[in-house]
């Protein structure tokens, strides 16, 4: 992965002319994540309220990104817990879609598109949280993997799960079908105009193949 850099040259620099120029690292994203304040329960109106505050008070200082954390597809979301076993909001391919009770502008298949548009009009960016892997619900229903002849049970690794969030199974590392699943998921998120993804549960023990398959 290549990370772009910017180069700044100081005209008063007394170093030799052939010395490497100093390189400034890009700053990390600056913004706000909904988890600490809302857990899994944030609503569309609360996102917009925080976006307006950021636009009015923080944007000029470089704060420009809002991230909707875990549970945006959970119709039974509560505080900072997870609703193990509850039916989640997913599409025909098992990809998570927003809970329309909390995000009413997502109705009629619009997803986060209208909300992203509203945030963009404030000069800000919108992101969401996703877990590695594939929803267990998609696997139990053996839903198709979009763009392939495969189904969820063909690509899932049911032995490789998260210890603290039971929404997903892992995906078969290094498998073309797993890549197709991630591609389809990211295609949907990108179609909504999202700017940022927080990909969670990428922790020890690390599996380089699974990290690599997340790059789409």
Outline where the language-model segments fall:
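Mature N-terminal, pre-catalytic/accessory segment of carbohydrate-active enzymes
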Residues: 1-35, 41
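N-terminal small/glycine-rich loop or linker at the start of catalytic domains
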Residues: 22-38, 155-170
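Conserved strand-to-helix beginnings and helix N-cap segments that scaffold or border functional pockets
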Residues: 44, 209-210
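Aromatic-lined carbohydrate-binding/catalytic grooves of carbohydrate-active enzymes
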Residues: 50, 54-118, 122-209
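Conserved small/polar residues in nucleotide/adenosyl-binding loops
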Residues: 216
């Amino acid at each position: 992965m290549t990370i772009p850099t910017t180069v700044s040259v100081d005209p008063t620099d007394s170093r030799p002319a052939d010395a490497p120029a100093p390189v400034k690292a890009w700053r990390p994203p600056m913004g706000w994540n909904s988890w600490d304040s809302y857990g899994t329960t944030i609503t569309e109106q609360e996102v917009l309220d925080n976006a307006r505050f950021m636009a009015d008070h923080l944007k000029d200082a470089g704060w420009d990104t809002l991230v909707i954390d875990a549970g945006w597809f959970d119709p039974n979301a509560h505080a900072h817990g997870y609703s193990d076993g509850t039916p989640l909001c997913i599409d025909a391919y098992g990809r998570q879609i927003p809970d329309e009770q909390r995000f009413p502008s997502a109705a009629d298949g619009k997803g986060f598109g209208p909300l992203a548009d509203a945030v963009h009009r404030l000069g800000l960016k919108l992101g969401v949280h996703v877990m590695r892997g594939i929803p267990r619900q998609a696997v139990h229903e053996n839903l198709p993997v979009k763009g392939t002849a495969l189904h969820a049970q063909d690509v899932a690794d049911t032995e490789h799960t998260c210890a603290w969030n039971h929404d997903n199974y892992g995906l078969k590392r290094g498998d073309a079908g797993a890549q197709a699943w991630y591609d389809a998921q990211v295609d949907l998120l990108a179609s909504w105009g999202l700017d940022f993804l927080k990909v969670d549960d990428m922790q020890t023990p690390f599996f380089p193949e699974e990290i690599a398959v997340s790059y789409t």
